[in-house]
């Protein structure tokens, strides 16, 4: 019985011994080659710049720079909302009067949900879009005051 217990303890100790792996040593007595793993980690990064204010009747540049992302991906900037009722492009004054405005990306009208800028690092690591925030028609203005509102942009990584 003692021999069985001793054998079991020796076996358990042998299984618990760890082996250290060293780099390959090549000496004059040995020949061959050795391999070494090389690792370099690049974290994803990009910068999106959206102005914090624009005056109707002027433009604003939205830009993406320093794009380093996963292969097969692209940075997408979308206009995804407004402070207007039902996401309408409207601004209000303190008394609640509303004025409608439009947004254009070049000659194209921008609607809520539209992509305004895409940067794919396969072709460029920077990009910009000039959005024109067109003032309301002068004939539609009835009340004075300072009108304000917001637009919301969403930045996504999508498959290229």
Placement of each model-derived feature along the sequence:
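Sec-dependent N-terminal signal peptides of Gram-positive bacterial secreted proteins and lipoproteins
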Residues: 2-23
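A surface/secretory-pathway sequence property marking extracellular, secreted
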Residues: 87-111
């Amino acid at each position: 019985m003692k021999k069985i217990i001793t054998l079991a303890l020796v076996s358990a100790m042998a299984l618990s011994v760890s082996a250290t792996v060293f780099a390959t040593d090549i000496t004059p007595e040995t020949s061959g080659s050795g391999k070494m793993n090389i690792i370099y980690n690049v974290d994803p990064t990009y910068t999106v710049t959206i102005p914090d204010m624009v005056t109707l009747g002027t433009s604003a540049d939205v830009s993406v720079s320093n794009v380093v992302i996963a292969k097969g991906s692209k940075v997408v900037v979308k206009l995804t909302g407004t402070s207007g009722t039902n996401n309408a492009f409207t601004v209000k004054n303190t008394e609640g009067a509303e004025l409608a405005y439009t947004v254009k990306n070049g000659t194209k009208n921008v609607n809520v949900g539209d992509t305004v800028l895409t940067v794919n690092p396969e072709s460029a690591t920077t990009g910009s879009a000039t959005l024109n925030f067109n003032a309301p028609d002068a004939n539609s203005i009835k009340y004075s005051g300072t009108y304000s509102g917001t637009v919301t942009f969403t930045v996504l990584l999508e498959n290229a």
